[in-house]
Curated annotation (Swiss-Prot):
Belongs to the V-ATPase E subunit family. One of its GO terms (molecular function) is ATP binding. It comes from the Bacteria. Keywords: ATP synthesis, Hydrogen ion transport, Ion transport, Transport. GO terms for biological process: proton motive force-driven plasma membrane ATP synthesis. This is V-type ATP synthase subunit E. The gene is atpE. InterPro entries: ATPase_E_C (IPR038495), ATPase_V1_Esu (IPR002842). Signal peptide: none annotated. The keyword Ion transport applies. Produces ATP from ADP in the presence of a proton gradient across the membrane. One of its GO terms (cellular component) is proton-transporting two-sector ATPase complex, catalytic domain.
Length: 188
């Protein structure tokens, strides 16, 4: 090989080596850039997943808290309904108690006071004997109504005006206030 060929061959070889080094450097730079982008993308994705996880965890905790609150509210409602049922049972048992004649008489007095000039007093047939003396004293007629329980009804002239005074109606009217007091006593 001639000297010229050797020089050309060396130059070509040097140029090839330079191109290879440049290509390797560019490839290394591209690789580094790609790795940095991939790392940044991976970190961003990890942060997004972590944020999604925290949000899902907060939603699950909120849902759990809501379920617990709902269960507590439902349980409290059931307890209050049980209290109300027992109070009704106690009221319904009053006619068998020795103090019932005095209770029904007081209910009748309150009804008559609320309706001055009443002409009749209506009560359950079983309660009429307890009200006979009061009816004579007040000059009102006694009338039987089997459906009327735990109370009385004063009836005005011509039957247009009536005042009912029963323990169950009183319980119904007072239940909101009573139930809040019961709840306060039970749960603070």
């Amino acid at each position: 090989m001639s000297k010229l060929e050797a020089i050309l061959s060396q130059e070509v070889e040097a140029e090839i080596q330079a191109l290879l080094q440049e290509a390797e450097a560019k490839a290394e730079a591209v690789k580094r850039e790609a790795e940095e982008k991939a790392k940044a993308l991976l970190q961003a994705r990890e942060r997004a997943l972590e944020a999604q996880y925290r949000a899902a965890l907060r939603r699950a905790e909120s849902a759990g808290e809501l379920l617990v609150a709902t269960a507590r509210t439902q349980a409290r409602g059931e307890v209050l309904e049980e209290v109300r049922r027992r109070v009704r049972e106690a009221l319904e048992a009053l006619p068998q108690k020795p103090e019932w004649p005095e209770v029904v008489r007081k209910l009748a007095l309150e009804a008559l006071e609320a309706l001055p000039g009443a002409k009749a007093l209506v009560a359950n047939p079983e309660d009429l004997p307890h009200l006979e003396a009061l009816a004579r004293e007040r000059g009102v007629e006694l009338q039987a109504e089997p459906a009327l329980r735990l109370g009385v009804r004063a009836v005005g002239a011509e039957g247009k005006t009536q005042v009912e005074n029963s323990l169950l109606a009183r319980l119904d009217r007072a239940w909101d206030a009573l139930s809040s007091k019961v709840a306060q006593a039970l749960w603070g």
